[in-house]
Amino acid sequence: MAKVLVLYYSAYGHIEKMAYAVAEGAESAGAEVSVKRVPELVSEEVAKASHYKIDQPAPVATVEELGDYDAIIFGAGTRYGTVASQLRNFIDQTGSLWAKGKLVGKVGSAFTSSATQHGGQESTILGLIPTMLHHGMVVVGLPYAFQGQMGIDEIKGGSPYGASTITGGDGSRQPSEIELDAARFQGAHVARIAAKLAD
């Protein structure tokens, strides 16, 4: 059984919802799944003033534990075409894991969100891939086997690089069912590959 970590940062709850959908998919494929978040970098005062969703039940991860998993699925919103600094800051602390090769051969994957359809979803996930490769991880995306990517009948996130959701400029749009299905598919896809590699 593969051990999968869904590691996320979510300011307003969109990525949190996607993270639990990813976890649901991984569990459906037989994985043992942990959902954890990275630490917030802004003060509680600023978070409250900005209406961040601060009541997230997922525990905060530690860098040291990342090597305990067969797969890590990273999730964070897009900030000006790149990953939110909270996740980037956490990842930038993994030098000791890199030095010991703790993530070599593990599966890495990512999902994201943006305010608009062309708000940097692909560039955000693509920006995470070099980090995974530097760690020696096996990168897995969201293949077109997930047919939900193919239609143009509704606004939706998702690409071969990973699942995503579009929040709207004011954050009022929540992940749609097809976006959550994409997240579930990606979680299951990662879990199956991780199980094969862990054998």
From Swiss-Prot:
Positions bound to FMN: 10-15, 78-80, 113-119, 134
EC id: 1.6.5.2
PROSITE patterns: FLAVODOXIN_LIKE
InterPro entries in the cross-refs: Flavodoxin/NO_synth, Flavoprotein-like_sf, Flavoprotein_WrbA-like, FMN_Rdtase-like_dom, NQO
Gene3D superfamilies reported for this sequence: 3.40.50.360
Family statement: Belongs to the WrbA family.
Protein name: NAD(P)H dehydrogenase (quinone)
Organism of origin: Sinorhizobium fredii (strain NBRC 101917 / NGR234)
Organism lineage string: Bacteria, Pseudomonadati, Pseudomonadota, Alphaproteobacteria, Hyphomicrobiales
